[in-house]
Amino acid sequence: MMNNNGFSTGEEDSRGPADQICCLLDDGERCRKQAGNASYSKRIQKTVTQRRLKLSIDSHARHIYICDFHKARIQCARTKRRRRDSEDDSNETDTDLPEVDLYQLQVNTLRRYKRFYKVSTRPSSNKAQLSETIMKHFKTIPIKEKEILTYFIYMVKSNSNKLDQKNNASAEAT
């Protein structure tokens, strides 16, 4: 078995990532998702450190393959950084991303979100601080845009939208 500073050289894993689980620890807990073909390189490790993602490689892992979920999460953090850098250069804001005003929510709702996602805040945070911290977390949640848009288009084309059905029923009644 060839081992290089805790990282696999890949020589001992000729079977590939097909039957392996992700090599990452997510907030101290080993990920149980199936590993894809993306590997946890030093460049990715640097991105994880810079973006303060709570990810690290499991020292007991015999490979460096990561799952698609963590790959997407790391890519999301990387593209957000690029986007912010380019906004700073051009003095423009990203207009195609809608801004959600979490301050409009009740404090109990914000606290419930905080508890559900285990977002750490100061114990005596006021509503403004709480909504700001939650907004930072909210923006880090990865979404599958293609999947969501495909589903939306399918629902519209197949008239499966409940709002469309209500509108058609009221139009037929008149």
Swiss-Prot record:
UniProt GO BP: regulation of DNA-templated transcription
Where are the annotated Atypical zinc-finger regions? 22-70
> What domain of life is recorded for the organism?
Eukaryota
Chief place of localization: nucleus
Q: Which terms in the GO cellular component ontology are assigned? A: histone deacetylase complex
Q: Does the keyword Repressor apply?
A: yes
Keyword list (alphabetical) reads:
DNA-binding, Metal-binding, Nucleus, Repressor, Transcription, Transcription regulation, Zinc, Zinc-finger
Provide the protein's localization. Nucleus
Q: Which Gene3D superfamilies match?
A: 3.40.1800.30, 6.10.160.20
Fetch the Pfam families from UniProt: SAP30_Sin3_bdg, zf-SAP30
Question: Family, per the entry?
Answer: Belongs to the SAP30 family.
Q: What does this protein do?
A: Required for the function of the class 1 Sin3-histone deacetylase complex (HDAC).
Report quaternary structure and partners: Component of the class 1 Sin3-histone deacetylase complex (HDAC).
Protein name, UniProt field = Histone deacetylase complex subunit SAP30 homolog
- From what organism does this protein derive? Anopheles gambiae (African malaria mosquito)
> Which lineage ranks, top first, belong to the organism behind this chain?
Eukaryota, Metazoa, Ecdysozoa, Arthropoda, Hexapoda
